[in-house]
Amino acid sequence: IEDYDFETEFGPDVGDKAPDFALTTASGETKTLLDFPNMFLVLEMGSITCPLYQSRRGIMERLAEIDGVSSAVLYVREAHPGANIQSHKSFEDKMGCATRLTTKEGESRTVFVDGLEGKAHKAYGSMPNAVFIINKNGCVVYRAEWNNPSATRKALLDLLAGRAVTAKPYFRPALPTTVFRTLGNAGKG
């Protein structure tokens, strides 16, 4: 937690050009982050040990079912590493966690794996569960430091209808059951 600056916002704001990176996906392909087929990309930051990400995963996956919407995850450093899922010491460690997320935990979205140094994550502000909506021109049209699926969905529906975004992101904690399961899987820290 000491690595996060909760007082200062970093990363692209609404109206800014979204940073683009060529990254390896959990399936081993190299893809460009902003090369998506639809009108909008919902990009969520996440890791297997982040209770906020884990609690919102199913709802966020369903957003990709909306016509005109692509959805992806930027796999970042572990939010709450423990004895079982440790801080990444190599890119292979990080790739292993991202692969586990897709194969064992069922994440269906494209999972981009950031480098060990977190260059893409830093460019997007370094928050563990931020979300960005990016349009086809590569412009950020919505951002939230903490993902709230209801606000994200409302923003998407506004954008798809050609309206100004009225959704206001706000922090919503994960359910205790998800917190205990996620941290239990990570192991004692």
Description of each model-found segment:
Residues 1-41, 127, 143-189:
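Non-globular targeting/processing and membrane-anchoring segments
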Residues 30-61, 71-75:
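Short active-site neighborhood of thiol/selenol oxidoreductases, capturing the structured segment around
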Residues 48-50, 78-79, 118, 147-148:
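Short, solvent-exposed loop/turn segments at secondary-structure junctions
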Residues 105-107, 113-155:
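Thiol/disulfide oxidoreductase modules built on the thioredoxin-like
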Residues 54-56, 84-87, 125, 144-145:
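Short, solvent-exposed loop/turn segments at secondary-structure boundaries
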Residues 68-114:
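Conserved segment of the thioredoxin-like fold in thiol-based oxidoreductases
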Residues 30, 77-81, 139-140:
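A short, flexible beta-alpha/helix-coil linker loop
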